[in-house]
Curated annotation (Swiss-Prot):
Mn(2+) binds at E315, D339. This is Pyruvate kinase PKLR. The keyword Iron does not apply. Pathway: Carbohydrate degradation; glycolysis; pyruvate from D-glyceraldehyde 3-phosphate: step 5/5. The lineage of its organism: Eukaryota, Metazoa, Chordata, Craniata, Vertebrata. Its cofactor is Mg(2+); Mn(2+); K(+). The keyword Cell membrane does not apply. It comes from Canis lupus familiaris (Dog). The record marks K313 as: Transition state stabilizer. There are 4 isozymes of pyruvate kinase in mammals: L, R, M1 and M2. L type is major isozyme in the liver, R is found in red cells, M1 is the main form in muscle, heart and brain, and M2 is found in early fetal tissues. ATP binds at N118, F119, S120, H121, R163, K250. SUPFAM superfamilies: Phosphoenolpyruvate/pyruvate domain, PK beta-barrel domain-like, PK C-terminal domain-like.
Amino acid sequence: MSSQENIQPQELWSRISKSQRDLAKSILIGAPGGPAGYLRRASVAQLTLELGTAFFQQQQLSAAMADTFLEHLCLLDIDSEPVAARSTSIIATIGPASHSVERLKEMIKAGMNIARLNFSHGSHEYHAQSIANIREAVESFATSPLGYRPVAIALDTKGPEIRTGVLKGGPETEVELVKGSWVLVTVDPAFRTLGDAHTVWVDYPNIVKVVPVGGRIFIDDGLISLQVKKIDRKGLETQVENGGLLGSRKGVNLPGAEVDLPGLSEQDAQDLRFGVEHNVDIVFASFVRKASDVAAIRAALGPEGRTIKIISKIENHEGVKKFDEILEVSDGIMVARGDLGIEIPAEKVFLAQKMMIGRCNLAGKPVVCATQMLESMITKPRPTRAETSDVANAVLDGADCIMLSGETAKGKFPVEAVKMQHAIAREAEAAVYHRQLFEELRRAAPLSRDPTEVTAIGAVEAAFKCCAAAIIVLTKTGRSAQLLSRYRPRAAVIAVTRSAQAARQAHLCRGVFPLLYSEPPEAIWADDVDRRVQFGIESGKLRGFLRVGDLVIVVTGWRPGSGYTNIMRVLSIS
């Protein structure tokens, strides 16, 4: 996020000379003798030189000053610098390619904010070691309190999903299913670890009852398609429609079939207990279809896991249709496009993505965009141009987090994938039309008597009006930081907290830069507030958000504890 804020020239009248006012007018209305867009572009550059950099954010400045969205698009400049610091969080899946401490350190340096553990693969022992490695890698940055990088750990449940078994050669083996060949899909336990090119075991006993002759079975995000030709006591006799390489433990989709799996399996319950015991921060709940599925997960976490955030993954048609009730009881949403693109027509996935991100933005809840974002980087060092556009458009849609799956879990270039997503997000964030976005979010905000929420709206508007370089918020649970993030300030939200978990979970919220303050409380509460604010300022200077002369908005409470945030101050950095 940049350390500078955009402001409209007509708001500077009391601070600039008449010649500069005339110049500012030419920016907004054009000038005689040439195209308004060209003159606006040239005039903005001249005005910036005359006024210095204190009043304007430099990234995509001409587009940021636009009066309409179409004009904003026309004025985007490929030579403009990206934002100084990325505000969209990066979630990276940890697997064989990224399991080691050294590789995790590299990924943290590259920009990983949340580490995802996929419990569809691996044993509890394997994931316990992954958690230990992640924490060791994070602690290696703890020598400097100002440079410490809290990384959240997320447990992704298996959920009511169907998967294939293990192939004969072991978990790393792949076999090719050739188009036109015959494959037996069986539930016979004897084939659980003996799959091959002609026999595929699946872990759903009722598959022979719910898939009719003529029905289709999709494997591995739909890359492999089988059509059922015959059903007998051995299983489903199928013919390969679309072939490909089949690995172990791949996801299976049965489009159109009424799958009767429970929302929370016994395996999921065991995995959730494991997560509570190992203090994970987030649960990504797979295949959530209705609000009661979320309630079951919350109950399974128990009182010890009450502070764990539940992010519901929307992966089928039922989940999309019941989205509002799921959103209401969830802490956030993941747009899981892999399975979703099989359960609903692929050409409608973008509609579901935009709808879900928009509703999450209105509700002020985090939303993650996931699956196949940089898929080609599993085997190649550079993404396709379509993939870079996909990541950028997820950011422009309003996603709080963007996720890497196989790219970092099993890919050849896990660190490079994180770096690429980081670079794309920085460019995309510079192109967000913040002027329109904040106005729409503010208008859509319901009337509230909650002092914290009212203060958050005021702080974000003040940051726009005075061109604040950052908003520093002191928070105990992270709620104040999330409320500030809801209104998408262009300034960095520096969240100072003594809660390690709140610092880690803050990465779910766009534009929030969490700081863990580990000093003991001062005897006088006002002194303690000042010390934490100063800690935030020093960190902002270190990260490049703040410079001498910049204004910052400070949001604090009127007394110790959570739920009392209602004070806003404007400070100048000295």
